[in-house]
Amino acid sequence: MSASRPAAVMVLAAGEGTRMKSRRPKVLHEICGRSLLGHVLAAVAELEPQRTVVVVGHAREQVTEHLKSIAPHAITALQEEQKGTGHAVRMAIEALRAQNVELTGTVVLTCGDTPLLRGATLRDLVAAHEAEGNAVTILSARVPDPTGYGRIVRDAAGAVTGIVEHADATEEQRAVDEINSGMYAFDGALLSQVVHRLSADNAKGEEYITDAVALLRGDGHRVGAYIAPDRTEVEGVNDRVQLAEARRLLNARLLEQLMRDGVTVVDPASTWVDVDVRVGRDAVLEPQTQLQGRTVIGEGAQVGPATVLCDTEVGEDAVVSHTVAREAVIGPEATVGPYAYLRPGARLDRGVKIGTFVEVKNSTVGEGSKVPHLTYVGDADIGKGVNIGASSVFVNYDGVNKHRTVIGDYARTGSDTMFVAPVRVGDGAYTGAGTVVREDVPPGALAVSAGPQRTIEGWVERKRPGTPAAQAAERARARSEEDR
């Protein structure tokens, strides 16, 4: 089935979501790197609607600000008081009219808390709606336990005759497993007319959009329903339990697609990816790996176990284990970890080794260079073929400003070297163990700042008499004298 571009899509996002027990509006809670509302709008965008209207209410400032970053062209409609779904639709229509937009053609109504909704399902809903010539087409779903949901009522021929709420349903109707999702495709002109006929004469004093279905059918218009192929797509999120379940389901969907595209996921139950993550073929994701934001993993790379990468690029055939990296670039065939920390601005070229307990921040490390152990690299430019000795520190902060250190190609630095920036170590230069580099080191030079070793015989026995160390020293001295 093919569908035209809808005249408008309305997204209802005005509710408070009290069951979330949160200061944050429900629709702004996130799963897999995107807000609930963001997931819905991403599905809506696949329809390429002429207009998108988001109905806001509770915490409207926060929701509106969020919309500026994820859907800047969306129109916001204010529902000052939450008086029901029908009232929300009326506010959306008024917002469109304020921009001189009269609804003609198909209008889709969605909810802002259904993050598993697929764009393909919305396209099929619109296609079925237009092919059948319906005034309204309900997006329905078949569920194993329909308790609490409105049921889709059909006649003997299978034609939709209406929606009956659970409380009003007969025993026969309660046995029906096809439920109303609260999402619809409407004829825009008819919706604009019928929405003003909705009544708030009910227990809650609210206007319900479901009443529009009965009114349109009563006027002799055709009503239909399109059954979602996956019932989880229409499940809303109302509390933290449902939020966790939605996250699990979406993560499983994303991982399944990665595996079908040629990625090995060793343990899907402990591996988490965001929707904007990209992973190349033959990459391996080990257990307890989290890929967040816009992380990109190259072909053949191995990531994990116990690794968190956020907005990080990993090159082909790189190996990253037990590592946390944020806004970093890891080059092809590089090796990182275990227990490394790459902070924003860390750039590792091809074949770089970053070893155990190494932190890199706002620095470049050239091709084939190694920082193997217990080192902090901050605000540095390290050339190619360099080896940084264990326990070295790039001292980049003078208490007021940060300064850079430059290490030339093929330099070798001894263990426990301190580079007090700003300082430059030339190509092929060496530093001795324990050196504090405060001045530039010319190419090919050896920098040594430590003085001759001073040994004070008998110091422990005199200054720490009776201690285990002193006793051990006395025994060793006695053995030495016996050997003579």
Swiss-Prot record:
Location of region: Pyrophosphorylase: 1-240
Gene Ontology MF: a single term = magnesium ion binding
Q: Where is the composition biased (Basic and acidic residues)?
A: 474-484
Q: Keywords on this record?
A: Acyltransferase, Cell shape, Cell wall biogenesis/degradation, Cytoplasm, Magnesium, Metal-binding, Multifunctional enzyme, Nucleotidyltransferase, Peptidoglycan synthesis, Repeat, Transferase
Instruction: List this protein's GO terms for biological process.
Output: cell morphogenesis; cell wall organization; lipid A biosynthetic process; peptidoglycan biosynthetic process; regulation of cell shape; UDP-N-acetylglucosamine biosynthetic process
Key word S-adenosyl-L-methionine present? no
Q: What are the positions of the active site?
A: 373 (proton acceptor)
- What detail does the entry give on cofactor binding? Binds 1 Mg(2+) ion per subunit.
UniProt region (Disordered), positions on chain: 457-484
Which positions does UniProt annotate for Mg(2+) binding?
Answer: 113, 238
Instruction: State the top-level EC class.
Output: transferase
Localization (cell)? Cytoplasm
Give the span(s) annotated as N-acetyltransferase.
Answer: 262-484
- For whether the record's keyword set contains Acyltransferase, the answer is yes
Taken from the UniProt entry, a GO cellular component term is:
cytoplasm
Positions annotated to bind UDP-N-acetyl-alpha-D-glucosamine: 12-15, 26, 79, 84-85, 150, 165, 180, 238, 343, 361, 376, 387
Its annotated pathway? Nucleotide-sugar biosynthesis; UDP-N-acetyl-alpha-D-glucosamine biosynthesis; N-acetyl-alpha-D-glucosamine 1-phosphate from alpha-D-glucosamine 6-phosphate (route II): step 2/2; Nucleotide-sugar biosynthesis; UDP-N-acetyl-alpha-D-glucosamine biosynthesis; UDP-N-acetyl-alpha-D-glucosamine from N-acetyl-alpha-D-glucosamine 1-phosphate: step 1/1; Bacterial outer membrane biogenesis; LPS lipid A biosynthesis
Q: Where does acetyl-CoA bind?
A: 390, 396-397, 415, 433
Q: What's the protein name?
A: Bifunctional protein GlmU
Q: Which organism is it from?
A: Thermobifida fusca (strain YX)
Q: Which gene encodes it?
A: glmU
